[in-house]
Amino acid sequence: KPGRGLQVGSVNMDRVTEYLGFHPALHDVSPTELIDTRVLVEAGVLPHVARRMQEDASLYERLNAINLNLRQARSLARWVELDIAFHRELICASRLSPLMAFTDVLAVFFRRFRESVKKAEWSQGIESHQRIIDALQAGHVGEADQEMRAHIESHRERLPS
């Protein structure tokens, strides 16, 4: 009988992204586009995160806990996992739910920039994270913005020529 075949209700892009390791739209994005996208999204959420931190101290505590765990990371894999977690938590802390879709960019970024992350001075990254969240907690969005931009832009210096 007609209508008795297979029906697909919906596709869960989160599961597809998890399986593929990236959202299909991010497959051919250049390294500079990834950096620019991260700067735009992550610097853009900072005023919202600062405002939310004033209302909810646990946001700072969660970000600080991730950063403390980064200090204990001894392998590149663990470092990348925690660094992604930090930046994802920062975006999520904005409570701007449409931007949470951009957290896929983080996984793609760290996969593509693995060599850059290897060469980066991890302690500088940790201290940069700390300056960002401390500035946000104090309500100094401009300082946090400057630090975030420098933090992400530093990967340009390590791009292959």
Where are these regions (language model features)?
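Short arginine-rich
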Residues: 153-161
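Short linear motifs at protein or domain termini
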Residues: 1-41, 47, 161
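Short helix-capping and inter-helix turn/linker motifs at the boundaries of alpha-helical repeat units
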Residues: 120-124
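Conserved amphipathic alpha-helical segments that form helical-bundle/coiled-coil interaction surfaces
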Residues: 34-115, 125-129, 143-154
